[in-house]
């Protein structure tokens, strides 16, 4: 475990790799990761552990845990899904991640940060004009995950002071207002 959240991903992975290469009979055991997020590296360390031989991860919904928290289930699930080349399938139905996150948040009375990866309110919200235009042209320009894959209906194009014409036209279209080219 990285109980203090101190390790860098390279260090954590090296520890797992060392055990895999130097402990007799280690393949009869299941090495597990248990990382804390004191330096914001719990997910990266967990993934490094998995890449180097750990076959079990100890994670929590929303990263809830001691001090700065533990590795976030939703981050690990979606990171492994995005990096299919690793050949690791969790078997988890990711479409329930957002609803489970919100349920845990409500029951624990622990709000989820708006900018929390995967399940935060702003995880699929775009407020900058260039990002909005890019997402409206092709979601893949600025989103590596389809919101539907985590149980959301769609991305949010928020009208802000940083929005551009594309976002305004998009909003007007949603409202059924059609502008002529010169407007």
Predicted feature residues:
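Hydrophobic faces of well-ordered beta-strands that scaffold small-molecule active sites
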Residues: 1, 29-35, 57-59, 76
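Glycine-rich phosphate-binding active-site loops on the catalytic face of alpha/beta enzymes
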Residues: 52-69
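Alpha-helix-loop-beta-strand connector modules within alpha/beta enzyme cores
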Residues: 13-33, 78-83
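A mid-to-C-terminal "edge-of-domain" accessory segment
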Residues: 78, 85-183
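Aromatic/hydrophobic pocket-lining residues that form the small-molecule binding cavity
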Residues: 12, 42, 97
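Active-site-proximal loop/turn and secondary-structure-junction residues that shape catalytic pockets
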Residues: 2-7, 35-41, 61-65
């Amino acid at each position: 475990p990285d109980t203090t959240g101190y390790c860098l991903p390279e260090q954590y992975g090296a520890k797992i790799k060392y055990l895999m290469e130097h402990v007799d009979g280690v393949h009869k055991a299941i090495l597990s990761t248990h990382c804390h997020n004191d330096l914001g590296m719990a997910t990266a360390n967990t993934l490094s552990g998995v890449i180097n031989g750990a076959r079990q991860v100890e994670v929590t919904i929303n990263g809830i845990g001691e001090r700065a928290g533990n590795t976030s289930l939703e981050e690990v699930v979606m990171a492994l899904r995005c990096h299919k080349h690793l050949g690791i399938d969790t078997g988890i139905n990711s479409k329930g991640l957002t609803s489970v996150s919100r349920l845990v948040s409500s029951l624990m009375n622990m709000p989820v940060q708006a900018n929390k990866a995967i399940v935060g309110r702003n995880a699929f919200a775009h407020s900058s004009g260039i990002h909005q235009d890019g997402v409206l042209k092709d979601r893949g320009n600025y989103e590596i995950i389809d919101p539907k894959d985590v149980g959301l209906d769609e991305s949010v194009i928020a009208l802000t002071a940083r929005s551009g014409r594309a976002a305004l036209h998009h909003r007007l279209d949603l409202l059924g207002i059609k502008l002529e080219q010169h407007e």
